[in-house]
């Protein structure tokens, strides 16, 4: 059975509590979308999909854990909105399969409260927005789709006050992943014309060009067998721009119109980054490790090494600003821990480039407003850095409307490690047959 718990601030003549979260959303709706509202109230929603949990258990848990008795009230039915004045309801929750950290924390709390839960019990979190103002359904859909919910990871439902008074409700449908498919390996015939190969790349969203598709075709022709769908996907992923950095590795024909000269650059990365660093490394013995590990390592005194890693998370942050930036910063935290024989993260850094957060123009389809990206990215790096115990010691933010299509989200982590560990150079590591592997995270 699914139980619903809704939590909101106390309302009524005896309460002068301000909904700071609601006021923040009201301001963002005005700033980002140009839509004025009289008020916004935000309720927390929890759906408990638990087998052996009773209504009494849920009431006790909500009383003791979910709601603050001084400032909040809760209901275990979908009636809490009756406490507030509103014209529209928008309820937002995660799509099936999307990580719901608040829901996981609520389940952990329930397990602690009750002593145990079933292995397949789940809790799903969401938010119910109560909007008051002169809005039509088109306005509400715009607010929901462009600001309150991110369609990549979230779902939303809309009710008018009229529908609410008539008894219509959102309901307790939980976003469990339901799959009844059997694993199947598909054979792919690559004996195709060049145009058919490109059609295959487009239809399977491989994002590979003609030369790459022909190389795959020729490879399996030499093997004298068909490729499987899994093999094709693995090759496409490995050859993606994200993994392979094909632009950095490509031959670039460069024309200098000032000096009237032309040259072919064989890999921007190898010519201007790796080669330059290698030349410095040959002259500077304090450069201990570059291009060989999860991070670069230098020696800063007789006893200490400093490791540094930075990377971009641009496209993920454009799709899901908070999640994209969060995984960017914790990813480089991980790389520092994993470089050499382990380094301790001591600092984070970042550089952000966005379009103006006050952008008023028409956005292309599927693009988030730059103000929304700005706020989400900032929160993601903050949560993954400062709030995990690693201080963000410096950074910069640059605004230019040419970043409207894709922001630059540059995240970095620095760490310290001793020069030697048990008599061995800490920046060197090797894996041998029979070694144990530890996975963490």
Where are these regions (language model features)?
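Core nucleic-acid recognition elements
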Residues: 1-441
């Amino acid at each position: 059975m699914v139980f619903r718990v809704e939590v909101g601030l106390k309302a009524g003549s005896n309460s002068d509590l301000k909904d700071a979260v609601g006021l923040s959303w009201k301001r963002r709706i005005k700033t980002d979308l140009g839509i004025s509202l009289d008020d916004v109230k935000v309720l927390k929603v929890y759906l408990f999909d638990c087998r052996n949990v009773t209504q009494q258990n849920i009431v006790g848990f909500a009383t003791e854990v979910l709601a603050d008795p001084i400032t909040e009230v809760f209901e275990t039915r979908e009636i809490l909105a009756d406490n507030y004045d509103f014209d529209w309801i928008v309820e937002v929750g995660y799509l099936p399969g999307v990580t719901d950290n608040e829901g996981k924390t609520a389940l952990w709390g329930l397990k602690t409260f009750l002593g145990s839960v079933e292995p397949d019990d789940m809790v799903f979190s969401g938010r119910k927005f109560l909007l008051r103002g002169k809005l039509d359904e088109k306005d509400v859909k715009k607010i929901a789709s462009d600001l309150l919910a991110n369609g990549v990871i979230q779902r939303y439902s809309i009710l008018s006050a009229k529908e609410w008074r008539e008894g219509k409700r959102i309901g307790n449908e939980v976003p469990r992943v339901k799959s009844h498919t059997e694993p199947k390996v598909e054979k792919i015939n690559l004996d195709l014309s060049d145009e058919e190969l490109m059609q295959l790349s487009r239809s399977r969203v491989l994002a590979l060009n003609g030369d790459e598709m022909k190389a795959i075709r020729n490879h399996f022709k030499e093997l004298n067998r068909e490729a499987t769908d899994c093999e094709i996907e693995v090759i496409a992923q490995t050859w993606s721009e994200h993994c392979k950095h094909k632009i950095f590795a490509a031959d670039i024909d460069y024309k200098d119109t000032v000096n009237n000269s032309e040259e072919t650059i064989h890999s921007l990365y190898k010519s201007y980054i790796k080669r330059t660093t290698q030349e410095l490394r040959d002259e500077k013995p304090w450069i201990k490790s570059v291009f060989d590990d999860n991070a670069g390592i230098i020696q800063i005194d007789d006893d200490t090494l400093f490791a540094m890693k930075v990377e971009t998370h641009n496209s993920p942050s454009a799709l899901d600003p908070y999640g994209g930036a969060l995984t960017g910063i914790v990813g480089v935290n991980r790389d520092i821990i994993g470089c050499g024989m382990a380094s301790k993260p001591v600092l984070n850094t970042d550089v952000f480039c966005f379009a103006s957060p006050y952008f008023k123009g028409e956005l292309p389809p599927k693009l988030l407003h730059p103000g929304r990206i700005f706020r989400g990215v900032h929160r993601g790096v903050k949560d993954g850095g400062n709030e995990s115990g690693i201080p963000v010691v410096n950074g910069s933010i640059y605004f230019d409307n040419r970043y409207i299509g894709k922001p630059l989200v540059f995240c970095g982590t620095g760490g310290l490690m001793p020069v030697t560990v048990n008599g061995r150079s800490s920046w060197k590591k090797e894996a041998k047959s029979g070694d144990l592997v530890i996975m963490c995270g």
